[in-house]
Amino acid sequence: MFCVQCEQTIRTPAGNGCSYAQGMCGKTAETSDLQDLLIAALQGLSAWAVKAREYGIINHDVDNFAPRSFFSTLTNVNFDSPRIVGYAREAIALREALKAQCLSVDANAHCDNPMADLQLVSDDLGELQRQAAEFTPNKDKAAIGENILGLRLLCLYGLKGAAAYMEHAHVLGQYDNDIYAQYHKIMAWLGTWPADMNALLECAMEIGQMNFKVMSILDAGETTKYGHPTPTQVNVKATEGKCILISGHDLKDLYNLLEQTEGTGVNVYTHGEMLPAHGYPELRKFKHLVGNYGSGWQNQQVEFARFPGPIVMTSNCIIDPTVGSYDDRIWTRSIVGWPGVSHLEGDDFGPVIAQAQQMAGFPYSEIPHLITVGFGRQTLLGAADTLIDLVSREKLRHIFLVGGCDGARGERNYFTDFATSVPDDCLILTLACGKYRFNKLEFGDIEGLPRLVDAGQCNDAYSAIILAVTLAEKLGCGVNDLPLSLVLSWFEQKAIVILLTLLSLGVKNIVTGPTAPGFFTPDLLAVLNEKFGLRSVTTVEEDMKQLLSA
């Protein structure tokens, strides 16, 4: 086992990365190794997808499957070894079908990629785990050095984050052939074990640029189906009655669940990154979508244990449900998996609803506590002139984007302290689950404009980018000249690709933490600092002083 993709990874003087029987996330060495094998199979599939496009062949089954199954290897998504192997077998079957299509056009068609002809050696998980050793990401570290390995992983993990957003967009009916062609090209190239530093840096920026397009079609998918988010108050306390909790990012799953629970007497609560769903008109129209439950994903083992109903996980983040003894009432969807947990194959939530009706639910309604969400792209752009007016009248000094992933490290209190230290004449724009560090606090307003503005899920960084570009255009300056600072928390691969997206668009002087990714070497950090001004957090006082004086 070697895995260094998330913030929790083991860090020692000898090196970084989980490399024992179990990773810090709870992933076993077996599952981790089999995920490496799956990635190799997917690289071979992408190699043939690139070749097929040379013949004008576009196989939508391949395009749909490839990023979805890659998403299953993201942190806290799928811990189920047999399902990971199943994805690998499906990847090889699709590859062979695609290869046959190519050969039907050109009898001499071939693919030079080292992963292009990968076959699984056995049905036995132990044998497959031994085979996976050929594909462990650090297998040639001694030959290439830590810097090249770090850049490879930056590209691999960044592409994994983009694949997750591609799947979210695909579920909503969005498809862009250029994006998929670019994805396959990059995935196939990474399967050649590249070792050129400049080429890898260019690839990282290409992934960021591609992801901006992915976020654009994801935004289109969400707003076309569910309307543009508008500011909406959400209750974060319990309402009397039977209940279901839904977590993750998949708004379509939430919509289906709301449709199927309507009139059943079962209330639905959002959790984690589902919180922004309350801002969408076509979702909040369901009156039994009664509120948001819980806090950051890392607290779920305590909070889920207390929830008096079933829980549905639609994407990341799931952690060991046996710890809180709620494994008999947590359900996984799509690419999510945990051994022994019930999995919903289709869109029928009937078994979950039946379980909810058999449980007690909340015995009484608590005194409501309302927070506001729903500052989506359209709302933000509508406020652009107001922001400019406030800046021109010196009523608004600075905007801080404080957001990103949450996590369990104590150092993450930095983001709570930072938000509460923001001066009263400054605005906080937030997104993703890092907001749970401070989104239930009171921040007041500036002439009626809330000082805390919740822009949505992690992918809604797209809305923040569009707002920044619009403000810069209206003010006749560059984005980096705006009174705007980005203070970002990272945990996993979606955050990595958001960072690459921002860097690829030329956004500079981003502050990130609480720690640097374990695959960032000192040399790589120095390059990113020199080129983009990227740096790690220090203290709230020092960072605030520096950002306000920039």
UniProtKB/Swiss-Prot annotation:
Pull one GO CC term from this UniProt entry: cytoplasm
Q: What InterPro entries is this protein classified in?
A: HCP/CODH (IPR004137), Hydroxylam_reduct (IPR010048), Prismane-like_a/b-sand (IPR016099), Prismane-like_sf (IPR011254), Prismane_a-bundle (IPR016100)
Binding residues for [2Fe-2S] cluster: C3, C6, C18, C25
Textual note on the cofactor: Binds 1 [2Fe-2S] cluster.
Write the Enzyme Commission number(s) for this entry. 1.7.99.1
Which Gene Ontology BP annotations are present?
response to hydrogen peroxide
What is its subcellular localisation?
Cytoplasm
Binding-site residues for hybrid [4Fe-2O-2S] cluster, renumbered to this chain? H249, E273, C317, C405, C433, C458, E492, K494
Q: Which residues carry this modification: Cysteine persulfide?
A: C405
**Name of the molecule in the record:** Hydroxylamine reductase
Organism, scientific name: Salmonella gallinarum (strain 287/91 / NCTC 13346)
Identify the gene encoding this protein.
hcp
